[in-house]
């Protein structure tokens, strides 16, 4: 996808124009369901807007996931330097992952639903 090309969000694809902590809820939701991909450097309409400092942003993404979601989800990061984008792929899992706010999230496109589970 080149700059200017557009895509659409789906149940397993989310766009983030820049790195904010809201992506952690999406990671948790994807991991608690069938998995999914977050593309950083795309606006809400799927337009490639690029992201600055790709390597530094990747380190921040890894640090946030590793410290803010327990147990740690199975994920991979890849960069697309030509288009200045980052692809975060989260695999679905049967474990119930949660952010440190201790709320479970399930993704049901187009929204994420908090769910309370009796233990």
What are these regions, as identified by a protein language model?
Residues 1-119:
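Conserved N-terminal catalytic/coupling substructures associated with nucleotide/phosphate chemistry
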């Amino acid at each position: 996808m080149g700059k200017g090309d557009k895509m659409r969000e789906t149940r397993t694809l989310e766009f983030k124009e820049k790195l904010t902590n809201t992506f952690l809820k999406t990671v948790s939701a994807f991991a608690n369901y069938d998995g999914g991909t977050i593309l950083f450097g795309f606006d809400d309409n799927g337009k490639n807007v690029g992201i600055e400092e790709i390597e530094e942003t990747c380190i921040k993404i890894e640090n946030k996931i590793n410290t803010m979601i327990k147990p740690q989800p199975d994920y991979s990061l890849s960069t697309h330097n030509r288009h200045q984008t980052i692809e975060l792929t989260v695999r679905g899992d049967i474990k119930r992952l949660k952010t440190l706010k201790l709320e479970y999230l399930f993704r049901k496109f187009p929204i994420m639903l908090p769910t309370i589970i009796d233990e």
